[in-house]
């Protein structure tokens, strides 16, 4: 069930625009430096400055070469990639096809959460040191998009540092690759003090040309919204993201700040357990979410425009589908938000055998997305008008 699309906003101190060092703050810290361990937005965003994929998105979300220079279909299920020559990892080790094969085997290990990005790929074959064949179990139209987040590690470095296996983050395992990096990317992570700061410096030996003038980055996670904004206004940091929507208008009018904003490709949605026969935190006789009428009633009860206006302060877009504008496959015809219909929702619940409504628990993060807990609480209040009684279980993510 889709709710809305985020519109990201970042504020920068005007004095930082010519600086070589960028002091950046956001709400969350990374979870690990292991690029295959945790599918977490902040972690992926930062770690991908050190590690690179075979292909990457440009600023318009179009696929362009990265560690692969070209690719072509050999047959409907096989894509041949030519790899970039004369690329070295940060420790000086040359990049070859062996590193791609190793990374493919590694990312699929069950203790990680990044397997989705090589989903459908059956095998990667080495043709020579700079040519590989990626073989899928069936035609795979999303292969290149997924490979944007399939980051390549050095086989030699992982073997040397006993990091052939992905860190078991859930078991609180600490490995060398979880606290150190060795990629081919534009920045070298020099230091990470969890929940305090992360320091990066430009990789002078990078195969590509660095965009912009930033040679050093100091990233500081600041959970408190007021503290993060105060750090920006005082000059302790140069840029902040994850801004509270209620403060955006005020900050826009601050002469010493510049704003960068635009739509994200993230869609916020509610996921329901449709697989279990009965719910852990709901009616014990049956799983109400298996009935499409219940799910439709829940969707019809949500006023997406009210969330956009009152909670997100017009920094979101109502959504009806999971695919965001700008992403391949988006359809404006399908993304038409239907008006809220409380009476229609009540009728659907009655038809489904629940004239007195339904009850369940809604798990919701309170530190991952902008206004995440507030959005969940608003949805619960909207549901209540249709007889849908949900208990909010807000929790920290990570």
Task: Kindly give the residue locations of the regions a language model identified.
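N-terminal lobe/hinge region of extracytoplasmic solute-binding protein
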Residues: 25-75, 105, 182-184
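A structural "hinge/loop" feature
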Residues: 28-44, 67, 93, 143-153, ...
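Gly/Pro-rich hinge or "lid" segments in bacterial periplasmic/extracellular proteins
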Residues: 62, 151-211, 216, 342-343, ...
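Aromatic- and charge-enriched surface segment that lines or borders ligand/interaction sites
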Residues: 69-113, 127, 131-133, 138, ...
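Surface-exposed binding/hinge segments that line
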Residues: 72, 116-166
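Alpha-helical secondary-structure segments
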Residues: 97-103, 131, 185-186, 214-216, ...
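Ligand-site clamp/hinge motif
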Residues: 204-250, 292, 380, 389-391, ...
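Structural transition elements
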Residues: 300, 317-351, 368-373
């Amino acid at each position: 069930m889709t709710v809305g699309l985020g519109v990201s906003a970042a504020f920068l101190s005007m004095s930082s625009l010519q600086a070589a060092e960028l002091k950046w703050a956001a709400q969350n810290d990374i979870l690990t430096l292991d690029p295959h361990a945790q599918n977490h937005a902040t972690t992926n965003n930062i770690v991908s400055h050190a590690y690179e994929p075979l292909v990457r998105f440009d600023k318009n979300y179009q696929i362009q070469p990265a560690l692969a220079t070209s690719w072509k279909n050999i047959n409907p299920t096989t894509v041949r990639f030519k790899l970039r020559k004369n690329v070295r990892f940060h420790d000086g080790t040359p990049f070859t096809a062996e590193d791609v094969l190793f990374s493919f085997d590694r990312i699929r290990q069950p203790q990680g959460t990044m397997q989705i990005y090589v989903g459908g790929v059956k095998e990667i074959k080495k043709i020579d040191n700079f040519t590989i064949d990626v073989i899928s179990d069936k035609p795979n139209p999303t292969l290149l998009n997924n490979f944007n987040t399939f980051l390549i590690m050095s086989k030699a470095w992982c073997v040397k540092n006993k990091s052939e296996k992905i860190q078991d983050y859930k078991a609180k395992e600490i490995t060398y690759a979880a606290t150190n990096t060795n990629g081919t990317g534009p920045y070298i992570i020099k230091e990470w003090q969890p929940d305090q700061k992360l320091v990066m410096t430009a990789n002078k030996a990078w195969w590509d040309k660095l965009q912009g003038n930033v040679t050093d980055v100091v990233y500081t996670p600041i959970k408190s919204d007021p503290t993060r904004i105060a750090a920006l206004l005082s000059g302790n940091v140069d840029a902040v993201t994850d801004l509270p929507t209620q403060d955006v208008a005020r900050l826009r009018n601050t002469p010493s700040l510049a704003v960068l904003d635009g739509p994200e490709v993230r869609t916020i949605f509610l996921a329901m357990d449709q697989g279990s026969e009965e719910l852990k935190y709901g009616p014990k006789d049956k799983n109400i979410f298996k009935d499409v009428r219940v799910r439709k009633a829940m969707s019809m009860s949500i006023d997406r425009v009210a969330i956009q206006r009152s909670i997100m302060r017009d920094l979101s877009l109502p959504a009806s589908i999971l695919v965001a504008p700008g992403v391949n496959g988006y359809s404006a015809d399908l993304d038409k938000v239907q008006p809220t219909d409380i009476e229609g929702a009540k009728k659907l619940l009655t038809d489904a055998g629940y004239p007195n409504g339904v009850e369940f628990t809604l798990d919701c993060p309170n530190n991952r997305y902008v206004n995440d807990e507030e959005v969940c609480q608003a949805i619960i209040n909207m549901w209540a008008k249709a007889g849908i009684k949900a208990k909010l279980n807000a929790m920290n993510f990570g």
